[in-house]
């Protein structure tokens, strides 16, 4: 068995669910799980400084291989001493493989071959090519603590035969990526389980990847248009297929109920651009549901955004002021709203960890969803 650069330590299992409390040890520190990871696509979490992220207690952030490959270039980042030094972040970093972005840019399925994927840059339209070896090489240059294998991420609703071929290719690509990995002593590589909504294909993917002894395992191909019920069903049969002594990462999920439901099903790590993306539109997550701060009813509301929140935004500014800043397109408004949403999700995970410790996660979920409004007819995802 490989001596991996990152290690998972199980602290406690919740008595009534598949949830687990643990920690992940990396070359740049240890973070508790379950954990939500803010997304810093281009080596920055939009509008946030590294110091602010540390005060949130996020513990780990995510950056995007595809975007950093194109700009400023992975070789330049390596010249700077790696991503940690480049962006002045001394805590763990996870990089994705770029696969999800690449597949959104592929204009023809014929451009996905056994060798790799041909596509056009979103910046200047030039033709690019990415394959498992290149994706690993870029991430080796970036120097992230946790890396992702290059996978094919098909839409959820695809014919069985197409998904089967995709799963088999992803397994072959995973092995190629593992063989190309130059820095196993200080970078942990995760395999990504695919298979859309087909249980037998998820089982095949998990079996293929767990036989390769990755440092951890990601669950991909979800949060791509399927229903919440369908996502939970896939997690119900996928997470039990993964090793208990390694981290489990659900990619691209950030809605509060999805985070809790993922934890209930044994997931340790989550990421999503949701909190910062909706914040820039003035949509905020609170203990009492979503708030669209642009609404006229907040114009004369001089109360805190969320009376149950102790973040910098809620302890210093009113709803009326936030509404004014967002309506005026002021950068400070984007910063305050982004800070709050990230604080909300990071602290939701802190509360979830306590609920696991207390063996009352199902009660916590019920109380949270009732307050948030998820139990109302036509409730929104976030």
UniProtKB/Swiss-Prot annotation:
This is Queuine tRNA-ribosyltransferase. Catalyzes the base-exchange of a guanine (G) residue with the queuine precursor 7-aminomethyl-7-deazaguanine (PreQ1) at position 34 (anticodon wobble position) in tRNAs with GU(N) anticodons (tRNA-Asp, -Asn, -His and -Tyr). Catalysis occurs through a double-displacement mechanism. The nucleophile active site attacks the C1' of nucleotide 34 to detach the guanine base from the RNA, forming a covalent enzyme-RNA intermediate. The proton acceptor active site deprotonates the incoming PreQ1, allowing a nucleophilic attack on the C1' of the ribose to form the product. The active site is at residues 96, 271. Belongs to the queuine tRNA-ribosyltransferase family. GO terms for molecular function: metal ion binding; tRNA-guanosine(34) queuine transglycosylase activity. The keyword Transferase applies. Pathway: tRNA modification; tRNA-queuosine biosynthesis. It catalyses: 7-aminomethyl-7-carbaguanine + guanosine(34) in tRNA = 7-aminomethyl-7-carbaguanosine(34) in tRNA + guanine. HAMAP family: Q_tRNA_Tgt (MF_00168). It comes from Lactococcus lactis subsp. cremoris (strain SK11).
């Amino acid at each position: 068995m490989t001596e991996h650069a990152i290690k998972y330590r199980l602290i406690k299992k919740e008595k009534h669910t598949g949830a687990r409390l643990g920690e992940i040890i990396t070359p740049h520190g240890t973070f508790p799980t379950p954990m939500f990871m803010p997304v810093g696509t281009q080596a920055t979490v939009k509008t946030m400084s590294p110091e602010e992220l540390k005060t949130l207690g996020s513990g780990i952030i995510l950056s995007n291989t595809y975007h950093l490959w194109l700009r400023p270039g992975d070789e330049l980042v390596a010249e700077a001493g790696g991503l940690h030094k480049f962006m002045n972040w001394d805590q763990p970093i996870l990089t994705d493989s770029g696969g999800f972005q690449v597949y959104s840019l592929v204009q023809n399925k014929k451009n996905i071959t056994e060798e790799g994927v041909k596509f056009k840059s979103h910046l200047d339209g030039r033709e690019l090519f990415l394959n498992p070896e290149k994706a690993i090489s870029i991430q080796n240059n970036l120097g992230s603590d946790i890396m992702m294998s290059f996978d094919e991420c098909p839409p959820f609703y695809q014919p069985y035969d197409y998904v089967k071929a995709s799963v088999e290719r992803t397994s072959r690509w995973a092995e190629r990526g593992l063989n190309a990995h130059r820095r196993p002593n200080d970078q942990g590589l995760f395999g990504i389980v695919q298979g859309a909504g087909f249980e037998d294909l998820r089982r095949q993917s998990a079996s293929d990847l767990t036989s390769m002894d990755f440092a951890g395992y990601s669950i991909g191909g979800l949060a791509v248009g399927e229903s919440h019920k369908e996502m939970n069903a896939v997690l119900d049969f996928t997470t039990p297929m993964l090793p208990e002594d390694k981290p489990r990462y659900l990619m691209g999920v950030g809605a509060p109920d999805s985070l809790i439901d993922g934890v209930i099903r044994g997931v340790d790590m989550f990421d999503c651009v949701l909190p910062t993306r909706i914040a820039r539109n003035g949509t905020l997550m609170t203990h009492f549901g979503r708030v669209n701060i642009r609404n006229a009813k907040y114009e004369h509301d001089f109360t805190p955004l969320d009376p149950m929140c102790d973040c910098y935004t809620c302890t210093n500014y009113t709803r009326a002021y936030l509404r004014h800043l967002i309506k005026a397109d002021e950068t400070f408004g984007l910063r305050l709203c982004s800070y709050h949403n990230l604080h909300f999700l990071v602290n939701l995970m802190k509360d979830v960890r306590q609920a696991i410790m207390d063996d009352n996660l199902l009660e916590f979920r019920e109380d949270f969803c009732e307050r948030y409004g998820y139990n109302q007819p036509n409730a929104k995802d976030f």
